[in-house]
């Protein structure tokens, strides 16, 4: 019997409290993601398309059989502008480095050059697609 495909998920987003996720260890977040993925597989999902957060490490762990889970098609970090849908910083958080990464699922990139660089970087890291979070959502 063919498996199901989840076309929009964020396996690193183990809670809707994104502020709490931003202070978690990346290793802990990955462990939680693997737990989520085992559950997805047990519900019949054999492929998932992660649209922000998962990367080559998550996909490789499944491919090599290190963890049990569905095949992962990933977009790496979702791209967002300052104040966009993927800018999860609190009002008191600032940054000066234009390559600043918003924790876990998105990445800030303001302007054409920064967006071009971010796309190229995510593709370099193996992203199968690119998600752009252009405005509030």
What name fits each language-model region?
Residues 1-64, 82-89:
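Metal-associated gating/positioning segment near the N- to mid-region
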Residues 66-137:
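Metal-coordinating catalytic core of metallo-dependent amide/deamination hydrolases
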């Amino acid at each position: 019997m063919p498996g199901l495909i989840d076309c929009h998920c964020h396996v690193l987003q183990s809670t809707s409290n994104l502020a709490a996720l931003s202070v978690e260890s990346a290793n802990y977040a990955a462990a939680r993601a693997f737990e989520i993925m085992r559950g997805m597989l047990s519900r019949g999902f054999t492929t998932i398309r992660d649209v922000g957060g998962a990367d080559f490490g998550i996909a490789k762990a499944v491919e090599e059989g290190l963890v049990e889970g569905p095949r992962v098609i990933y977009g790496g970090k979702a791209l967002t502008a300052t104040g966009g849908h993927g800018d999860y910083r609190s009002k008191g958080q600032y940054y000066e480095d234009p390559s600043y990464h918003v924790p876990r699922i998105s990445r800030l990139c303001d302007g054409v050059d920064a967006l071009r660089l971010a796309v190229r970087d995510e593709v370099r890291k193996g992203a199968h697609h690119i998600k752009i979070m252009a405005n509030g959502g």
